[in-house]
Amino acid sequence: MEKMLLKSTTRHVRIFTADVINNDLVFHPNKLTLDLDPDNEFIWNEDSLKKVNQRFTELVQERAGKSLDDYELRKIGSEIEGLIKYLLQNGLLSYNPECRVMNYSMGLPKTKEVL
């Protein structure tokens, strides 16, 4: 029986049980691929990207030996969403004003005028 590619999708995080080969997702039972902020809602700097990728790696390593099922993928995606919100609320990440749709999905920006 052929294995099926699993994915977990949140607003800003997509995780696949796949490897990227020639820009295509190819099922891999022991590999996770992260697609971060597919709608370009945020402006990312190297430090923020590093923090997210490092946390993703930690979460994957914590699950070494466990089945990569829908539940585990959703837990990882939720953790990464929480980190993105933390980065945004602490000024380490900002909304992209040129995003296709400005909906402030993680809350309104905090500015001195609002505080």
From Swiss-Prot:
Name where it's found. Cellular thylakoid membrane
Looking at its record, which EC class is this enzyme?
A: translocase
What are the UniProt keywords, alphabetically?
A: Membrane, NAD, NADP, Plastoquinone, Quinone, Thylakoid, Translocase, Transport
The primary location reported for this protein is membrane
Q: Which GO terms describe its cellular component?
A: plasma membrane-derived thylakoid membrane
Q: Name one GO molecular function term.
A: oxidoreductase activity, acting on NAD(P)H, quinone or similar compound as acceptor
Q: What is its EC number?
A: 7.1.1.-
One of the Pfam families matching this protein, by short name: NdhM
The record's catalysed reaction(s) read: a plastoquinone + NADH + (n+1) H(+)(in) = a plastoquinol + NAD(+) + n H(+)(out); a plastoquinone + NADPH + (n+1) H(+)(in) = a plastoquinol + NADP(+) + n H(+)(out)
How does the record classify its membrane topology? Peripheral membrane protein
- Which segments does the entry list as coiled coil? none
Q: Which HAMAP family match?
A: NDH1_NDH1M
Complex formation: NDH-1 can be composed of about 15 different subunits; different subcomplexes with different compositions have been identified which probably have different functions.
Family according to the record = Belongs to the complex I NdhM subunit family.
Name the job this protein performs. Answer: NDH-1 shuttles electrons from an unknown electron donor, via FMN and iron-sulfur (Fe-S) centers, to quinones in the respiratory and/or the photosynthetic chain. The immediate electron acceptor for the enzyme in this species is believed to be plastoquinone. Couples the redox reaction to proton translocation, and thus conserves the redox energy in a proton gradient. Cyanobacterial NDH-1 also plays a role in inorganic carbon-concentration.
Q: What is the protein name for this chain?
A: NAD(P)H-quinone oxidoreductase subunit M
